[in-house]
């Protein structure tokens, strides 16, 4: 049963690997170390960030969000994660949401994600969006 619950389609795994490569490449020059699948304890449940980039004064939490059917349910889960972690150390981390298949996200779902992430990136493919992801990470690093 746990295999079914934790199942991620191959496309999502490929996307996560591609984004991970982009984040790792950026982190080397920026002086960050990267952790994968970082678990954070919320008030009601545990949550997992796909990537967390850490340096001496910053933590940037990255979630790769797939829209499913219009994205609203996924956006609501992302919002719940933010609210559940709000009073924790992890709740103070800077948040980057990467939206896969950006054309499939409804306006309401996209707006909800933007309420909880400091930066949102539309991700079409690794070649065209590499610079956008790295620029967003850099902007979050520099933000006070």
Predicted feature descriptions by range:
Residues 94-96:
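Hydrophobic/aromatic residues located in beta-strands of well-ordered beta-sheets
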Residues 45-48:
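A short, glycine/Asx- and small/polar-enriched loop/turn
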Residues 39, 64-68, 98-102:
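Structural motif
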Residues 85-92:
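Arginine/glycine-rich "motif VI" loop of SF2 helicases in the C-terminal RecA-like domain
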Residues 68-81, 105-108:
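Active-site-adjacent loop/helix micro-motif of nuclease/hydrolase catalytic cores
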Residues 52-62:
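Active-site beta-strand-loop-beta-strand hairpin of nuclease catalytic cores
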Residues 98-144:
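Domain-level recognition of nuclease-like catalytic cores that cleave nucleotide substrates
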Residues 2-37, 144:
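Acidic-basic catalytic patches of nuclease active cores, encompassing PD-(D/E)XK
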